[in-house]
Amino acid sequence: LAYIAKKYQIQLVGGDTTRGPLTITIQVHGHVTKQNILQRSAAESTDLICVTGCLGDAAAGLQFRLGQLETGLLTDTDFEYLLQRLEMPTPRNQIGQQLVGKAHAAIDISDGLLADLNHILNASGKGAKLDISALPFSDALKKLPTEMATQLALTGGDDYELCFTATAGNVAKLKQQFPEMIQVIGEITEDVGMFYQNAQGEWQAFSE
C-alpha cells in the first residue's frame, strides 16, 4: 500500500488495514465534467467487450496461499508471480484515462469478470456473447488445466484489471496505444443475458 501510494502521489489516511475496537468508514466524493464520465450504464449493442492484462492470476495466487492449488504444475517463479499479482495488483490508471471519450462503459474487475461484466449489462439493459477461448492468461496460468484456468479467469476476483465496451474502431485505436495489453473477449448484444459458445458451437447461457 505504501509503495502504490508513493508511486501515484496519494496519501493513505485509513481504511480497513488494522484491527481495533473502533471502525470508521469514510466515503470520498468528487466532481467530474460530464464529458469525462465513464459509467457502467452506457454500453451499446455491437460494442466489443475488452479486458486489460491477464485474468485469474490473483485467484490462483490466493488458492496457492490457502494450499488449494496443485503445486506440481508450476515453478517457484510462477508462484512468486501469482502471489505478487494477488498482493500488489497494478492499477491500470494510464489505460483508464485513455478510455475517456473512447469507451462507452467500464468497470474494474474486483469481484470476477462474470460478476463485474454483469454489473455493466444490468445497468445498460444489454446482454453479451463471450468468446471463452479469447480470455487472456498469463504464462503461469497457461500451465494449469484449461478448465481450471478458465474458471479462475471468469470468477476469480482481485485482478483489478479493467473491463470495458467500445466500438471496433475505438478498440483498434486503444490497441495501437497499448499493444498486447487489451484483449477482445466478446460483444454486447441487444438481447439480455450472458452467453458463451460451447464445444458443439451452440450459444449457451452461463446459468445453464
Residue ranges and their predicted role:
Residues L1-V13, T18-L22, H29, V100-G101, ...:
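Glycine-/charge-enriched secondary-structure boundary and capping motifs
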Residues L38, L62, L86, M194-Y196, ...:
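Short clusters of hydrophobic/aromatic residues that line enzyme substrate/ligand-binding pockets
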Residues I49-G53, M88-L113:
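Internal active-site segments that recognize and position negatively charged phosphoryl groups
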